[in-house]
């Protein structure tokens, strides 16, 4: 029992059957005791608390260490436990979502439990064995230590497994179906310990959560919800009225007026604080609404931003394609411009030559025959010129068609280059830092100014390297096939072992059936023998009655004979009972051994299944 003058008490966070909650606030550094949920006797009339929930009540009681347990004492070990666990709600079975079968999760839970036990001052030493699987006695000590952190007044009885079940019901442990009395007796079993470890981890988490909740400090205004201030005012009022009563003063109403004024002032302050809190609450609600609207607007803007980013990527890709096409068209236009300039220069030369010839012709004396000859030559030249013009138009058309074919070839080449780069990236030779690139740059790029229009020598450099990569990939594929075959053989071996274990399990079950039938036969035989003994005893009693009626002289002899027969019957019945108990013990021992063996087989099958699943996952990842 702690001293009542301590400044801060630890709340007992265990649930209580009482719904009464008392609250006190410290005033001027005075010591305060923690609240009690147990029924208490009031010394004076209780006033209603100013708690906003309207569920608290303040009771003037002597200073003492309260508890969350009811004020009842334990009368016997098995009758009742003096704590809050007298009434508990019904707990429906819930499937445990925690991965208790995972060894890593078990290690984490065990580490947290052991660390908390060391921090909380657990008296017994904790070794490596306690981290994973303590004994039954050690588990009982650990659970008592943890539960006393929640309810210091609870006392455990001789049979701790019943107390553990009752305490877990009181704590509303959601997975109570996994914690039975038979499991609590066999703590060291591998199939039992994960559920027990999960329960201990849950209790430790509950204790840590409640300790954090108790450690929270709530600041309260000095003149608002201060019960000690009210106590002081009431005490001053009682002292003044008592002195006035002793002095027989006529001013008996003056303390009442001051008391009323004090409470009115306190109520006014509380009203002002309430109004201020209401206005603050409304402002916060408005801020929350504006923040929610802002969040919705932000979400819309984020969606638009993501859409614009996607459009930007598409636009950049389109712009890059257009840029490459513009560059190719620009180069083609430059070539055509050069050709046009050459043709214009040739045309200028021809014009100059024509002018010179015309000048020569005009300065010459030409006869009619020569003129006719010149006219015919001119006509011939015109015809030749027209033929040359038609040929030039045909050549221009052919050049245009050739340009279209060249552009189509360039587009096809660009697509093939992109396809090559994507395939090279998939097989791991692009970029330079890829796995199979060997620090070589095999990324194709179109170079219109180069001799081969691309930046790499496909025949002498790229193709031999790709053939080498293909050979290496083929070798890796064959190696993976060999590994897959080995894994398949291992899986077949595991399946055969599982089949053998299943056959062995069926044999054990058949032997168990035969043992049970033999047990039933022994039970029937024992009952028949007992009936025979009972019939013989009845027969002897009837003979005794007949002997009593026939002869009074042989009474002593018959009495001695009856006593000897009764002693013999008791000995036979006792021997039969011992034989029956021995048979029951042997059958129970055989059943226990069979059950342990079956559980061991199940655990082995689960381990084999996990190994098989792990191998299968590794194989799948390797194939991917």
Swiss-Prot record:
> Which keywords are on file for this protein?
Cell cycle, Cell division, Centromere, Chromosome, Coiled coil, Kinetochore, Meiosis, Mitosis, Nucleus
> What is the superkingdom listed in this entry's lineage?
Eukaryota
Q: Which GO terms describe its cellular component?
A: chromosome, centromeric region; condensed chromosome, centromeric region; kinetochore; Ndc80 complex; nucleus; outer kinetochore
Give the subcellular location: Nucleus; Chromosome, Centromere, Kinetochore
For biological process, the GO terms are:
attachment of mitotic spindle microtubules to kinetochore; attachment of spindle microtubules to kinetochore; cell division; chromosome segregation; meiotic centromere clustering; mitotic sister chromatid biorientation; spindle attachment to meiosis I kinetochore
Give the record's subunit note. Answer: Component of the NDC80 complex, which consists of ndc80, nuf2, spc24 and spc25. Component of the NMS super complex which consists of mis12, mis13, mis14, ndc80, nnf1, nuf2, sos7, spc7, spc24 and spc25.
Protein name from the UniProt record: Kinetochore protein ndc80
UniProt source species:
Schizosaccharomyces pombe (strain 972 / ATCC 24843)
Gene that codes for this? ndc80
